[in-house]
Amino acid sequence: MRHGKKFNHLSRPASHRKALLSNQAKSLILHKRIITTVAKAKALRKFVEPIITKAKQDSTHARRVVFSYFQDKEPVKLLFNEVAPKIGDRPGGYTRIIRLGNRLGDNAEMCMMELVDYNTYLQKAAEPKQTKARTRRGKGKLGATTTVSSEKTQPNTQDMATQAKPVENTQVEGADEQEALDTQSPEQTNKQEE
């Protein structure tokens, strides 16, 4: 009977299972996010979380232990230099499994597994963007720049309508002619062509 045996063998012999989990753990460390089946993701979570906890120690012995799982220097460097300092204060739970639905070919339940502190979608929404607005302040300071935060404010359309002045009968010579045509409205360009 199979009572109390919780370990998922993933229908593979031990060496194949070890290689699979090692390769997926390397991909997770290098790319911060992988797409796999839910069963493999749950097995990978049990495999990779103790490795990340070991990486928080940052000793030579810890590096050698982690290298014994990966057999590759690149994910070990990335884990100790970038990932471990970022998750140093987190007491476990370094990965997140997001279910994506079923795969078309075999109807396997798919998911996206990612490192928790590396969710780029949430970070982009949280960070305010800084944009540069070009201003012109006289002849001496052409192209002076000022930084403006990108807070979304709705401009008053009535003020813009009263401030806008139509461009009529502009006399332009040489290379500036194309720029003047680009700034005019389509109705004004039709009048000039006639």
Swiss-Prot record:
Region spans: Disordered: 126-194
Regions of compositional bias (Basic residues) in chain numbering: 131-140
PROSITE patterns (alphabetical): RIBOSOMAL_L17
SUPFAM superfamilies: Prokaryotic ribosomal protein L17
Top-rank taxon, per record: Bacteria
Record's GO cellular component terms: cytosolic large ribosomal subunit
UniProt keyword terms in alphabetical order: Ribonucleoprotein, Ribosomal protein
GO terms of biological process kind: translation
Record's compositionally biased regions (Polar residues): 144-161, 181-194
HAMAP family in UniProt: Ribosomal_bL17
Stated family: Belongs to the bacterial ribosomal protein bL17 family.
Protein name: Large ribosomal subunit protein bL17
Organism name: Amoebophilus asiaticus (strain 5a2)
Lineage start: Bacteria, Pseudomonadati, Bacteroidota, Cytophagia, Cytophagales
